[in-house]
Amino acid sequence: AMSETFMKERPILPLLASMALPMVLSMLVNSLYNIVDSFFVAKISEEAMTALSLVYPVQNFINAVAIGFGVGVNAVIAIGLGAGDRRRADAAAAQGIALSALHGLILTAACIAIMPSFLARFTSDSAVIQMGLQYSGIAFSFSVIIMLGLSFEKLFQAVGRMKITMAALLAGCIANIILDPLLIFGPGPFPELGISGAALATGIGQVLTLAVYLAAYRLFPIPVRLRRSCLKPDGPLIRRLYAVGVPAILNLALPSLLISVLNGLLSVYSQSYVTILGIYYKLQTFLYLPASGVVQGLRPLIGYNYGAGEHGRVRQLYNATLCASGIIMALGTAVCLLWAEPLMSLFTDQPATVQAGGAALRIICGGFLISAVSVTSSGALEGLGRGSQSLVISLCRYAVVILPAAFLLCRAMGPNGVWHAFWITEVITAGAAFWVYRRTVKHPTQH
């Protein structure tokens, strides 16, 4: 077995890169699913694109539950392995996967049930509602597959097998890219399914990803084995899984909540603003992914070094991550300022929407650079096991500051107020994040 002391011995930058790159790639692939779907769905009609934008937050929520709970399972497995407690790691894996499947079943039923009334709250256009129901009905029935796939991803990550997760994700993503145009437009022998085809293509991609994981689990020996004997519910273990998982789920689910509230504010003015917000969120995932990948790489490193009492290294790691995410955000800002309209036109062919969207992007990107502070501080706190402090930062960013700001500015300036609320929120949150992080890390707690 490889010893984990490399976390405090290897030079900072190569170490951070080796941990972060696989994470960045896997997250990019995950968001590619959504981008590819949008690209082809935009070719159907503007209504189809609006339907996709309205369903997106709910889809995002399902992913948040899967990934957030996976983070909990991952942490408990990694800690068990680190302490040499194989049985605990095996139990965490088995019960984590069983609970994930259960989450999938509950979410499938709940989301399909709420969808008609959910869509009706945001639009009165029956074509949009019809398409939204078609898409979500198929997309949500793959929830169990998504949950299981993400549990296996976190299982392989916890034992350091990043290459397997890459292969599985790529297989699913490539299948989705190939199947999307075939099932949406139906060339040759393929059925023309329209927006349902997009949902089906994504589902088939997810099935393929899970299949690769199951095959890899059979073929490659990994230190964690799933055994039936480990399925006996273990109360304290399950509580531990949720203690790490629930704050992580909330961190990931808050943006969904925000998008839905903002959709409500914007739909008063026109449907095209809802589409612009949907497009912005798709572009934004691309920008924030490399940054949050670096931060994901930081998590285990900062926790390990903090535990080992290496406070100097904790500070170096934090600063290196802050610089790296700052550089990424600066590049993102430049791209948005230079190519706002071309980026928008990838997802809509309405000239008015492209113009308004370009203007929106240029306003919003003012907050990118400073947001590196909150992204880094939040990740560092999670790595130190301070989930609740990290949640405070996310709450500022996605609810406490931005909702009142968007509401007031929208009253004062119309839809542009919503775009200004974004950068104002980033500035305020960065200040709060820095303060929370300094207060938490200044006094190393005696263990």
For each feature predicted by the language model, list its residue ranges.
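Helix-terminus/linker motif at the lipid-water interface of multi-pass membrane proteins
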Residues: 28, 32-50, 119-126, 182-193, ...
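Short runs within selected transmembrane alpha-helices of multi-pass transporters and secretion channels
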Residues: 70, 74, 139-157, 165-173, ...
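Short alpha-helical transmembrane segments in multi-pass integral membrane proteins
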Residues: 1-20, 77-144, 190-246, 302-367, ...
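Transmembrane helical elements of multi-pass membrane transporters/channels
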Residues: 18-37, 138, 172, 205-209, ...
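Residue-level signal for short hydrophobic patches within transmembrane helices
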Residues: 9, 13-32, 36, 58-65, ...
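Hydrophobic transmembrane alpha-helices of multi-pass small-molecule transporters
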Residues: 61-64, 108, 176-180, 210-214, ...
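Small-residue-rich hydrophobic transmembrane alpha-helices
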Residues: 49-109, 113, 146-160, 164-165, ...
